[in-house]
Amino acid sequence: DVIIAVWPWDAYLGEEALQNGIKVGVSSWRQRSFNAIPPAVKSSASYMNSILAKKEATLHGYAEAIMLNEEGRVCEGTGENIFVVRNGILSTPPLSDGLLEGITRDTILTLATDMDIPAIEESLTRSDLYIADEAFMTGSAAELTPINSIDDRVIGKRGPITEQLQKRYFDVAYGKVPEYEDWIT
């Protein structure tokens, strides 16, 4: 037997966050090692460091945390992938830096390409976060949520590339774009 339950789910990080963004902090907790639990494995055990990082972020007044990998490169949020925009170029860490291959991450990379927004996968440092013109997180629950500050360094309101991608993402998710209707299940 199978039971399927459906209910409305508000924005994971809040409706206001989708417009105004969230404050995030870089966590002292590192993302798990490739040698401990491979990033492609989505199990409850693989979220332990994320739980600790989220708790730390909340204690410091942040909505979310950004986790670094063992080498000190930007990895991901506690349950989200991260993107930055600098000089009109969209960047996100490569999977080889130890992050989960997010469905929403892949969607945003595809949409960016289709919208002629330059998008690359490259290793990012904490400094890259601090000098970003725009930043946002993606995930099945987080959808596409702008970041307005990182470690209390102000990035500002949702930027133009973030806004374009967010609008397109929601239009696709709600079946308003015929060329992506095969994505809707």
Model-inferred region functions:
Residues 1-185:
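Helix-start/capping segments and mature chain N-termini
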